[in-house]
From Swiss-Prot:
Residues annotated as binding substrate: 118-121, 210, 242, 262, 272
Pathway(s) of this molecule: Carbohydrate biosynthesis; gluconeogenesis
PROSITE patterns in the record: FBPASE
Presence of the UniProt keyword Magnesium in the record: yes
Family: Belongs to the FBPase class 1 family.
Cellular component terms per the entry's GO annotation: cytoplasm; cytosol
Protein name: Fructose-1,6-bisphosphatase
CDD domains in the record: FBPase (cd00354)
Binding site for Mg(2+) 2: 94, 115, 117
Superkingdom of the organism of origin: Eukaryota
Keywords: Carbohydrate metabolism, Hydrolase, Magnesium, Metal-binding
Binding site for Mg(2+) 3: 115, 118, 278
């Protein structure tokens, strides 16, 4: 974008681009907090080698995962920056086991769920990582938060986004009116609009999945991956690209097309990814970019979680790829169900 037409995130949020966006000033304030948290996190990552912030913090989180030092820094940055906006009612973090309260004097009317540092297991080898967030209006009529405020259908989100800390630092977001990308200009310290109305290709030729788990997949997933790898029906074989950092894998899928998959399997029936702050916000972005996201039977955005850290299977990407995946799910899982019922009857 020309330096004569720099549109910063704050300027964009207040522009006429969002004539239909409710509470524009509140959203601008809230996103100023998110942008600040992302800048703090980005700076901590870039300086981690100098400040001995790589490696483990010596604790585990609610998921029994080893917590990295940078996980702690990013989590603290998001909590501090979000509370300071006075727009947040309560929060959910991937790093904490329960709802995070906000004092009544600071509380606003939005619920924010976030993964402060997705893919942090890759940090020590300098792989790109990210932050993910989702925003809902609060459900409570008073100042007392409850599970009803956070256990929400994805389709009821007000906004969602992710930050990618890679060769460049990007903030990608949606308010339900398309997807926009902002790149951090380190010279001026601002996120600047660089990607307007991002849209995924109708069909792609890249698949992204951890094939180390293939022995645990159901028949439908095994056969689908086998088909796209082999170039069945005379088509060109898909290329495999899997980083193991969800933000990085989704960002590539969004730009180049294709499909990202983290299915449930016999080892982890509900998959690995958490709904509120991973699957739901990235599904919202994918749908707003003309893509699709499913748990294998229904759209991810139509789900309502039963717990704040609930895990769900997910397949998302180019619509033609998802439609083909669902055809395999219908064919093979239906056949499996029919066979199982026949064996049971006999």
């Amino acid at each position: 974008m020309s330096s004569n037409n720099l549109i910063t995130l704050h300027r964009w949020l207040l522009s006429d681009t969002h004539k239909n966006m409710e509470n524009k000033l509140e959203m601008a304030n809230l996103f100023s907090g998110i942008a600040l948290a992302c800048k703090i996190t980005n700076n901590a990552i870039k300086r981690a080698g100098f400040e001995s912030n790589f490696g483990l913090a010596g604790i585990t989180n609610v998921h029994s995962e080893d917590v990295k030092k940078l996980d702690v820094i990013a989590n603290d940055a998001f909590k501090m920056a979000l509370k300071s906006t006075r727009e947040v009612f309560c929060m959910v973090s991937e790093e904490e086991d329960s709802i995070i309260p906000v004092s009544q004097s600071q509380a606003g009317k939005y619920v924010v769920a976030f993964d402060p540092l997705d893919g942090s297991s890759n940090l020590d080898c300098n792989v790109s990582v990210g932050s993910i967030f989702s925003i809902w209006p609060k459900a409570s009529k008073d100042h007392n938060y409850s599970n009803d405020d956070v256990l929400r259908k994805g389709r009821d989100m007000t906004a969602a986004g992710y930050a990618l800390y890679g060769s460049a630092t990007m903030l990608v977001l949606t308010f339900g009116q398309g997807v926009y990308g902002f790149t951090l200009d380190n010279h001026i310290g601002e996120f600047v609009l660089t990607h307007v109305e991002m849209r995924i290709r109708t069909k792609g030729s890249i698949y992204s999945i951890n094939e180390g788990n293939s022995v645990f997949w159901d028949k439908a997933t095994q056969e689908y991956v086998k088909a796209i790898k082999s170039g069945a029906d005379g088509r060109a074989p898909y290329s495999s690209r899997y980083i193991g950092s969800m933000v990085s894998d989704i960002h590539r899928t969004l730009l180049y097309g294709g499909i990202f998959m983290y299915p449930g399997d016999t080892k982890s029936p509900n998959g690995k990814l958490r709904y509120l702050y991973e699957v739901a916000p990235l599904s919202f972005i994918m749908e707003q970019a003309a893509g699709k996201s499913t748990n294998g039977s229904s759209p991810c955005l139509d789900m309502i979680p039963k717990s704040i850290h609930e895990r769900v299977p997910v397949f998302m990407g180019s619509p033609a790829c998802i439609d083909e995946l669902l055809a395999f799910q219908k064919k093979f899982n239906h056949n499996h169900s029919t066979t199982s019922q026949h064996e049971k009857d006999n």
